[in-house]
Amino acid sequence: MPRLARPAGAAAATLALGLVAAVPATAHEPLVTDARVLTHLDLAAGQTPENIALDLDGSADVTFAYARQIAHVTDDGRVRTRATLPAVAHAATPLLHSAVVTGIARAHDGTLYVDYATGTSATGVWRLSPGDAPEQIAALPADGLPNGLALDERRGVLYVADSVRGTVWRVPQAGGTATAWAKGAALAPLQSAPARGLGANGVKVRRDSVWVSNTDRGTLLRIPVRPDGAAGPVETRAGGLAGIDDFAFPGHGRSVLAALNTGNRVVLVRADGTVTTVLTAQDGLSNPTSVAVRGRTVYVPSAASTTRRDPNLLLARLRHLIGR
């Protein structure tokens, strides 16, 4: 999640309100091993990675939120800017008060899609086709905060998690009008402490369902996709995930690797709701924002949003894929 425009004391108080007690990984067989920082990023230059999409060759594309950039990170850690989204005069993004690039998704042909939150008419989904400049393909409400982004190429749609409006938007992959696909209390931010104003955050498509994290509520949600494309009832799959940001599936089942931003942890949330910590600040995490998995390699960007030290991209290895 991007750094909120709040006093440091309030942020510290939020963190102090308690982190979920997780089941420790066994000392003899940790699920995630060989953690290393692939590249250390430049905080002063605005290189604070908010989200990640993987390329076929093992490299990655990340969003640098406040720099408004889409950057490419090679498999040996070199960083180059793919594109910078246009500056916006008088940006008024809710909670953040600045224009930020948040979620990112990659199509099979290399086209990238990102969320751009500005508090203006530029808020929405933008497309970056290979060799082209970024272009807006769908508008979203200026008073919202589009955050996570997921692509379902089979249905030809994108899903956007709006953290302020507590809504999952559905956008045609080719561009067009966004529709409110799912909303309600389970997706909304809290209205009282320990509220940060962030509801629906990360989003992923998994077979015939859309999974969403809710940061304020510390929950992981599943929303079935009905045969006509409409949203089914929201199911809570896990709770107690304080500071949850974005997440990924480390196998073919319903287990999830989730970034707990404020707790500097990545946890495994199994299908039965049990939680195990698999990576911590000792491994190099510094406000992790998202997780991606390709094969048995785990990618975790850290934005250093409150630690204010060492934004980075960390790699680790799964001992095995998770089948449940």
Residue ranges and their predicted role:
Residues 1-28:
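Secretory targeting and sorting signals
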Residues 65, 117-119, 163-164, 173, ...:
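Short loop/turn segments immediately following the C-termini of beta-strands
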Residues 73-78, 128-133, 172-176, 224-229, ...:
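Short loop/turn segments that connect beta-strands within beta-propeller blades
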Residues 119-153:
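Asp-box/WD-like beta-propeller blade repeats and closely related beta-sheet repeat scaffolds
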